[in-house]
C-alpha cells in the first residue's frame, strides 16, 4: 500500500491552524474528495460537525471545495458522528463527512469520511483522494457547480433512529438517568432520546460555547457525571464524548463502567436471546478479566490492534457482530455501522429491562483485573523492544503471572514512548512487575 501523507487511521486530525488542519487544506480536500466521488454515484455528500468553534470555518471550506468539484452538499450542522454515518445511508449520499476531533480539546479538529454504506472509506479511495490533493485545483464550469442545502430535520430523523433500537413494548419509565453530553454534538439529541423513551433525565454538558467541548466533562472526564449521579440519587449515568461515538457509564453507587464492561453486558444479553453471532472482539488493551469472564460463559474472544477501525476489520474478518474498546467505542453491527454512544446506551438499558437487573448486577460475575501502565521515554534509534534484556524480563514476568495475567509492550505512534502494561489479579504484584519491565527498558536505551 502506498504511504499516506494526510489520512491517519481515523481521517485527518491536528491542532487548528497548525499541522494539517487549515482552511486551505479543507478547501482542497473537499475538491479532491469531490473529484474522486463524482466519478460515480449520486454526486451528493453530507457534512456534519461537532460543536468546536472552528467547525464553522472548516464546514464552509469543505462546502466550497465539494461545490467546486461539482458535488451537491447537504449540511447537517452539529450532529454526532454516528448520525452522519446513518444519514449518509438513508439519503443515498455518495459520502458523509464529519468535522470533529472526537474526545480531543476544542483547539484540535479533524475531518473524516464515511462511504455510502456508512462505514469508513476504503483505503483505495483515501489514496485516490490523496493523489488528487497533489494536483492544482481546477474549478468545474459554472453549469456543473454543486448546490448546497440544509437537512432541516436531521435531528428528528436521528432521534427516531436511536429510539428504534429499544424494544417497542418497553419504556424507561421509573428510571432516573444523568446524561453528560460533553458540551458536544449530542447536546440536543441524547437527552431527548432518553426522555422520549420514558426516563427522567438530568442533563449536563449541554451548553456548548465552541470552546468547552470535552472540558472536564463527558466520557473522558467522569468526575462530573459521577458527582451528579450521587447528588440526584440517579439510577445510572451515561457519559458521551464530544462527537458521540464513545460511551462510559456510572452505576447508582458511583462506580465507573467502561467499554469492556459494556461489551460484557451486550454479549451476555445477545447470547441469552440467541442472537450472538460468534464471539466478541476487543483490543490489545482489553482487560483480561473480560476475556476470562466471556470464556466462562462459552463466548469466544479475539483481540485486534487498538483503534475502532481495527476492531471493525476483525469483526468483518471473523463474521462476528459485537466489538469495541475499553475507552468506550462500542460496535454492534446489528445496530449500525460505526461506534454509537447513544445506541450502545440504549442497548444496555434494554438488557436491564429484559433481565430486571440493575447496572451493577449485570456485571456481578465480571472481575476486572488491575492494570498498571508505565510510559518509558527513550531516545535515539535503538528499539528497546528488540533488546535481549527486555525480552528476558518480559518472559520472566509472564512466567510469574501465568494464565492469570498479561504483559503488553507497545510503542507510541506519536511520541518516543514505550508503553508497558501489566495486568493480573493483585495490584501490588502487577505494579512491581510493571516497574521491573520499565527499569529493563530504561537500562536498554
Curated annotation (Swiss-Prot):
Enzyme superclass (EC): isomerase
Gene Ontology biological process terms from the UniProt entry: carbohydrate metabolic process; peptidoglycan biosynthetic process; UDP-N-acetylglucosamine biosynthetic process
Keyword Phosphoprotein set for record: yes
Record field: transmembrane: none
Metal-binding keyword on record: yes
A Gene Ontology cellular-component term: cytosol
GO molecular function terms noted in the UniProt entry: magnesium ion binding; phosphoglucosamine mutase activity; phosphomannomutase activity
Residues recorded with modification Phosphoserine: 102
Record Pfam families: PGM_PMM_I, PGM_PMM_II, PGM_PMM_III, PGM_PMM_IV
Chain residues that bind Mg(2+): 102, 241, 243, 245
PTM info: Activated by phosphorylation.
Catalytic site: 102 (phosphoserine intermediate)
Entry EC number(s): 5.4.2.10
Keywords: Isomerase, Magnesium, Metal-binding, Phosphoprotein
Catalyzed reactions: alpha-D-glucosamine 1-phosphate = D-glucosamine 6-phosphate
CC cofactor note: Binds 1 Mg(2+) ion per subunit.
Family: Belongs to the phosphohexose mutase family.
Function: Catalyzes the conversion of glucosamine-6-phosphate to glucosamine-1-phosphate.
This protein's name: Phosphoglucosamine mutase 1
Organism encoding this protein: Shewanella amazonensis (strain ATCC BAA-1098 / SB2B)
Designated gene of the protein: glmM1
